[in-house]
Amino acid sequence: MGGFADTGQVSVRIRWVITMRAGGVLVSPFDFLDLGDHVGDDPDCGGHLSRAWLVAAIGLGVDRVVWMSQVHGDRVKVVHEPCDAVVDNTDALVTRTSQPALPVVTIHCVPVLLSDARPGVTAAVHVGEGRGSARCASPCDGYDAGPGCVRWRRDIAVLLGPAVSGRNYEVPVVIADGVEAASPDSCTTTRISAGTPGLDLRTGIACQFRDLGVMSIEDDPRRTVADRALFSHLQTVSTGRLASLVWME
């Protein structure tokens, strides 16, 4: 799944791509396009091979894609140029140059892609429940990190990618309460057991962005647990990871 953002009268266009299970060359349970590098498949023949396959399929060079090692934290890294090494202990990448393509790797957590075509800024953010709260690196803070970065948050466009739905995401009450305190509107009930608490992280994230003044928020309707075209460890214990990428052309 991919597309181009409407950038109006500007000199760059924003491109985003979200992968599915289809494509790639791997075998079950990582069939066929596992973009993770730590989920039990052979890292040399699994995730790394899939990553090379992906960047070739979408017409990017391997050296343009900057991967990060996500840790359910709040560290934002501003990227000035492509690099071969994985960016460690980071959950958000931001760039104001056209060279790096920024991916976020997920299964049930929320991939968040952000862009503002006028100043030429993009970001990829990993958001998930961690330690009883919705752990989110603040991409808006990252945008403000350097000269020429975004100054008006209302111009930022946000895409919330595929994630687990609240109806399938049962959590203990203490976790639900903690997430709701940090990210209002995240709590819901599940269909697993009537009345048990669940988390709809995308609703809570959208609420946070609106509170920050961001108005253009798009929500990919697909749910990882319910959609067999996507990976989910609630379908099978061992499984792969999806990738969501954003870059400028």
From Swiss-Prot:
Role description: Purine nucleoside enzyme that catalyzes the phosphorolysis of adenosine and inosine nucleosides, yielding D-ribose 1-phosphate and the respective free bases, adenine and hypoxanthine. Also catalyzes the phosphorolysis of S-methyl-5'-thioadenosine into adenine and S-methyl-5-thio-alpha-D-ribose 1-phosphate. Also has adenosine deaminase activity.
Reactions catalysed: adenosine + phosphate = alpha-D-ribose 1-phosphate + adenine; S-methyl-5'-thioadenosine + phosphate = 5-(methylsulfanyl)-alpha-D-ribose 1-phosphate + adenine; inosine + phosphate = alpha-D-ribose 1-phosphate + hypoxanthine; adenosine + H2O + H(+) = inosine + NH4(+)
Record family assignment: Belongs to the purine nucleoside phosphorylase YfiH/LACC1 family.
Protein's organism: Mycobacterium leprae (strain TN)
Membrane-spanning ranges: none
GO molecular function list: adenosine deaminase activity; copper ion binding; oxidoreductase activity; S-methyl-5-thioadenosine phosphorylase activity
Presence of the UniProt keyword Metal-binding in the record: yes
Annotated keywords: Copper, Hydrolase, Metal-binding, Oxidoreductase, Transferase, Zinc
E.C. number(s) listed in UniProt: 2.4.2.1, 3.5.4.4, 2.4.2.28
Residues annotated for Zn(2+) binding in this entry: H72, C109, H126
Cofactor(s) annotated in UniProt: Cu(2+); Zn(2+)
Subunit structure: Homodimer.
Pfam family, one: Cu-oxidase_4
Disulfide-bond pairs as recorded: none
This protein's name: Purine nucleoside phosphorylase ML0918
UniProt cross-references to SUPFAM superfamilies, sorted A to Z: CNF1/YfiH-like putative cysteine hydrolases (SSF64438)
PANTHER family named among the record's database cross-references: PURINE NUCLEOSIDE PHOSPHORYLASE LACC1, UNCHARACTERIZED PROTEIN YFIH
Alphabetical list of InterPro entries matching this protein: Cu_polyphenol_OxRdtase, Cu_polyphenol_OxRdtase_sf, Cytotoxic_necrot_fac-like_cat
